């Protein structure tokens, strides 16, 4: 695909759903969109980041219909009107998608905020930093220590403990999976309708809160969903990223972006 005044390139890549940067040409050099672009010999007009912060699978379904969300997502506090997105998708040769984590993370963070009366910012950073990645007694102590530093009232501590350790996010994770199971087939179908020829890459998921069993199960199911959708649809490739490291905001670290880029490049059909 070539653009006006630009040299010809073999590929145009559009990346959807990972909110690396709001500006489609303003993403960091170290992010996976940039690294994949370089690996395919693309400049920034041809390696395009379409990720939007806080986007859920339902939001993406709406965006792929009209280029806009019909209303604000109240939990995430997001509202996007981005009709150019559809043009980029129509022109792309490779479309990578990772969306679904926010379906669980957004309501869970709101629930945690409500439980702590919004004293929970530091605890959230600890939970998604990766330091609690391995289930162990030491990490349970670390979690309890983090709760203690919040200076919660008795009622707040009880509500937070129930949410985090008493299965309080079970319903959130189940609803997130059900939403993704309904929406992700629509996402794939809408992408294919917009662009019949592009290779669609469904990126796998990493678990930002692996200490909690219900979250481990959720992301295992989301990965299975992505793999199943790829098997059911022509020219759709599932790319697992089990070892992508995440930072305190649940997004990939620099090394995580490099790992994801390498996984995508290996999956691209030459």
Whereabouts are the PLM-identified features?
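Serine-esterase "nucleophile elbow" of acetyl-processing enzymes
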Residues: 1-63, 114-116, 253
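Residue-level marker of intrinsically disordered, low-complexity segments enriched
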Residues: 14, 34, 46-48, 70, ...
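Short, flexible/disordered intra-domain loops and linkers
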Residues: 25-28, 63-69, 211-217
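Short, well-ordered amphipathic alpha-helices
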Residues: 32-37, 68, 186-189, 224
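Alpha-helical cap/lid subdomain in secreted, periplasmic
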Residues: 73-269
